[in-house]
Amino acid sequence: MRHLSFLFALLLCMTSPFISLANDPDTALGIINGKVVDDASNQPVAYAAVVIKSEDGTKTITGGITTEDGNFEIKKLPDGTFIFEVQFIGYKTYSQKLIIAKGKRNLNLGTVILEEETKELEGVEVVAERTTIEQRVDRKVINVGKDLTTAGASAADIMNNIPSVNVDAQTGDISLRGNSNVRVMVDGKLSNVPVAQLLKQIPSTSIKSIELITNPSAKYNPEGMSGIINIVLHKNANIGFNGNINMGLTKGIEAKFNSSVDLNYRNGKFNFYGNYGNNIGKWVNDGSILRVEENSRQKFDFFNNNKSHLYKLGVDFYLNDKNTISFFTNQNIYDGKGDGKTQVTYFNNPSRNVTQLFFDDSNNRSEQYNFDYKLDFNKEGHNIELEVDHNLFESEQDADFSSTGASTFPNYMDFVDTDRTQTTANLDYVNPLDSISKLELGLQSRNFETKVDYSSTGQSFNSNGDLVPTPSTKFVYDMDIYSAYATFGQSYEKWSYQMGVRIEDVQVKADTNAVRAFTDKYTEIYPSGFVTYKPNEKDQLQISYSRRVDRPGLQQVNPIREFATPLLSAFGNPNLVPQFTSSYEVNYTKRIKNGSVTGGVFYRSITDEINRAIYIDRLDLNKTILTFDNFDNTSAYGVELSTNYKPIKWWSINGSFDLFSQTQRGLTETLNTTDPNPTEDDIVEEKVKVDNTAWNLRMNNSFTVTKKLTLQAFGFYRGRNKSIQFDANPMYFVNLGARYSFAEGKGTLSFNYNDIFNTMRFAFEGSYPYAQEGSFNWESNNVYVGMSYRFGSGKNRAKSRKRRDNNTKQGGGGIL
């Protein structure tokens, strides 16, 4: 507690000069304010255009956009009669007449309700779909389910269709703007499940939306160079009993099934809600790697049979209009079995051929318990909120390895048990000091503990070259983070700004077999700043800055072997230190007739970069070890362009282009010989520098054929991508889809044919640690059939809760 008290006191000293900037607006001119909400859900409508026109409606006088909470305020209006309008894609335009005069210069319009736009087609009323991608001030929001391209078996299946996001189908690693240092959240909370596994376990039908926050403010935790990806799950709060049922079947080589049920009951002061989703199926994966100089090939065949179940139960208790208590729990259960075969063939010397078989049996359970209390004061937007989140994760993995041929290792089994605990407590205070100023203060405590137990029945070589029993390892990794933040912002007629600072005190310790292997303590300051210029309701320019950190993730510091093949093993490095990034962005949004265009540029300055290190195994010089290390400072930059446009009423287009460039540095070792029996004298160490520029292009077209039938076509192209390990060849695919609505729009049937030309595969070539080339294939060519049905009705008064980012940098790399 003394950590938080000290940090909070320091923040008050730093922010008091900014609080004095708050001032009252000019009362000689008119002011109008209010809040815009959705008619069906009663949720705030963020970033809707608010327009003030002349009395005859022919001239635009001024305007603005609503905040994320749906609030708006227009100032400095002269006396007179005006037309007030609120516009947003997918809604009817709201319009009313206003009179500004002496004694009536401060108008509170209260709640402005927007109704969904409807069209009459052949006598049947059809509700218009809202834009799939919403461009907000600090984030992009992708509405899953509004678009056939976001239909699939799991979160991992839909991520590649999202602008600036890429998922490696082989390893499950996710990247944002070409960088894997991205934080992934579920409902704004950390999950103890490793990200690659988490994306495969969440059924796509359980997801409401996905948010991309590329330059978060000081209110958010600073982890993640490239930003935050927040997966928002469904939660109902409609009056009465309501629900949604979804199910889908994907068929490639094997079949995969997912389904979800989303229910709620609200009456009076209570809202009870729950969600169940599952993802059950079999996956096939294969590939090969050719070592050019020694003329050998590794061939891989993998098969997985996985089952995951996700449960969410919660209750909101509205004590009165000022006090709300909420509780929810997420339970995630996973059971996976896999087997694989690795064949190493030496074409010039078949006597060295090796075949390794393995069987993997793993299961895990993640439990999350969350409590929240919110107190609203009399002033609109003035509140304090306390949240406590406790997360448990248990995992057991048993792997059985057997080899035939020239292998010198007897058959063996590996056993890995993992236990993780995280407790987070937040206290947040928000105060609109006046009509143009807003102050936010907060404290946070995060406590992590991870225990990994490893044992094996196998043998390994010691330093003398003798086979000895593989020692057991117990690795304990603890991290405590205490932080405080403050943000202050003001909004004027055309200009707005926000400044913030976050202070963190971090303590890290790691023990291997009860011996202290590593400790680290540091206190850092993370400033942020945003300046926004809105000359009119159609244009917006924003410049932002934030300082970020990438703390080494568990797999990057864990000395226990992550995976192994006959020629490759991967380990963590307990001596890694954090990587720091200064991130700069400029974004411009232009609203045009029937759509909008958003463009942006970003630049990152990176210190103590964490990247791959590739070593020759000293106990077997024909094998390679993958690990991580810190390297020299570097930088990265990129550009993004996205648009949504409706050229005619039955055709809408969503497109995006992103380009990023970064200089990467790493360490590699190679063998300077072709002798099949090399010595340590043949090892050559080299510091590698790679200049990489890569780009992605996505284009989605949606066609309204009839009142009930919609067709879609989606195309994706990823350019060549370089890294320390290899250069990845270009990749591309085309998906086609159709959707049919029934039961007066309450039900939908969806059909997707993905990767119709079967072109999506990962192919590469590289020089480290050996000259090699290869490719990997998965079930990208598949058919998806889905159905959803909603029932019940009622108005929504959803509990508004903050969304937070949490995570640490994950391991990664794959088996190349």
Q: Residues of each region from the PLM?
A:
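Short, acidic, small-residue-rich periplasmic hinge/interaction motif at the N-terminus
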Residues: 24, 37, 49-53, 87-89, ...
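Short, acidic Ser/Thr/Gly-rich low-complexity loop/linker segments typical of extracellular
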Residues: 55-71
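Short acidic/polar hinge/loop motifs at secondary-structure boundaries
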Residues: 75, 189-214
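N-terminal periplasmic accessory domains that precede
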Residues: 111-113, 155-158, 174, 197-198, ...
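Surface-exposed extracellular loop regions of Gram-negative outer-membrane beta-barrel proteins
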Residues: 232-245, 285-288, 308-313, 322-325, 394-396, 507-508, 537-583, 603-626, ...
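Transmembrane beta-barrel wall of Gram-negative outer-membrane proteins
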Residues: 254-281, 295-340, 365-367
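Outer membrane beta-barrel strand-and-loop segments of large Gram-negative receptors
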Residues: 413, 422-426, 466-473, 478, ...
